Amino acid sequence: MDGFVLPPGLIRPPGEAPAYDAWLAALPQAVAGLADRWSLRLGPPFLPGGSSAWVAPAATADGDPAVLKVGWVHDEAEHEADGLRAWDGRGTVRLLRAHRDGQTQALLLESCRPGVPLSDVLPGPEQDAVLAGLLRRLWITPPPGGVFRPLEAMCGAWVRRFEMDYGCARALGRDQVDPGVARAAMALFRELPAAAPDSVLLATDLHHGNVLASEREP
């Protein structure tokens, strides 16, 4: 793909993750193929970009604005398309199309305009109020089929990762958290999700920088 721009956020040290390196090498061809598949005219990607997806403004064959997101499939993004389908534009952009090919997940998204991050337009306490209201809107009953990972399983994985990292840090004399506090915190990580009375859909990467102003949604 001539003139392909690779955002710096996608660049990782060579050899750190061979499968990711292969995905990144094939990314220009994947983007070009998706532009043909969906008849898109692409603009330059948003910079500096994220750490696992190439994202750029696009125009459809009808001239409608959209956004193309071509991502590396990893645990945190495994069910991104499923979540957007379930929310169907309620508190989120709408999912227009999706295509999965191996470790590449492509999403054609509604363009969010003006797209200004919440963190850029409101002071901290007001940001928190907006975020809290959005959280409640996104807490919907998960659709049937059980495709989403339960929070209990996610927290269990985080606990195991923390315990491994914390054990290594203690062995090297670099631990900065009291062992009792660490044990209590990890116990809560295990217990609270298991005791939750209701099951709702969660956005696991929701923060002030990921909430954008939109003309369609307040």
PLM segments and residue spans:
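Juxta-kinase regulatory segment immediately upstream of eukaryotic protein kinase catalytic domains
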Residues: 1-42
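An alpha-helical support segment within catalytic cores of ATP-dependent transferases
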Residues: 26-31, 143-204, 214-216
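A conserved alpha-helical element in kinase catalytic cores
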Residues: 28, 62-108, 116-138
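Protein kinase glycine-rich loop
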Residues: 44-49
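ATP phosphate-binding glycine-rich loop
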Residues: 52-58
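Active-site beta-strand-loop-beta-strand hairpin of nuclease catalytic cores
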Residues: 59-66, 214-218
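Hydrophobic residue at the +6 position relative to the catalytic HRD Asp in the kinase catalytic loop
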Residues: 209-211
